[in-house]
Amino acid sequence: MTLKLCVLTPNRIVWDSEVKEIILSTNSGQIGILPNHAPIATAVDIGILRIRLNDQWVTMALMGGFARIGNNEITVLVNDAEKGSDIDSLEAQQTLEIAEANFRKAEGKRQTIEANLALRRARTRVEAINAIS
């Protein structure tokens, strides 16, 4: 038995196919979803989506949004998403280093919050690459 997974951003469909299982980062922690999961709606955190296709796992960096699960269908609506295999590792590492430097020199509450979000996004992209290496 499989699940129908659809990952959407405002600009494109990132994923639309059958999967065996997913592990989703939510605001209250990670949840595993198998076929016949109870219906839920949840906020999606900045983090990694792990997708199992038969014996292979695929990763995707998600940048926050919402997910709806029901009737063996999962719809994930996020601000942005990238498959781990599509992320340039050198560019992602450079972005992470810049985000870390910006976080260290952030002044004031607003700058600190914005720098922290940029840092979390950069770390997630690097983690998505490393999870498939």
From Swiss-Prot:
Gene3D superfamilies: 6.10.140.480, F0F1 ATP synthase delta/epsilon subunit, N-terminal. It holds the Pfam family ATP-synt_DE. InterPro entries: ATP_synth_F1_dsu/esu, ATP_synth_F1_dsu/esu_N, ATP_synth_F1_esu_C, ATPsynth_dsu/esu_N. Keywords: ATP synthesis, CF(1), Chloroplast, Hydrogen ion transport, Ion transport, Membrane, Plastid, Thylakoid, Transport. It is found in: Plastid, Chloroplast thylakoid membrane. One of its GO terms (cellular component) is proton-transporting ATP synthase complex. Its main location: plastid. GO terms for molecular function: ATP binding; proton-transporting ATP synthase activity, rotational mechanism. CDD domains: F1-ATPase_delta (cd12152). It is a peripheral membrane protein. Disulfide bonds: none annotated. F-type ATPases have 2 components, CF(1) - the catalytic core - and CF(0) - the membrane proton channel. CF(1) has five subunits: alpha(3), beta(3), gamma(1), delta(1), epsilon(1). CF(0) has three main subunits: a, b and c. HAMAP family: ATP_synth_epsil_bac. PANTHER family: ATP SYNTHASE DELTA/EPSILON CHAIN (PTHR13822), ATP SYNTHASE EPSILON CHAIN, CHLOROPLASTIC (PTHR13822:SF10). Produces ATP from ADP in the presence of a proton gradient across the membrane. This is ATP synthase epsilon chain, chloroplastic. It comes from Ipomoea batatas (Sweet potato).
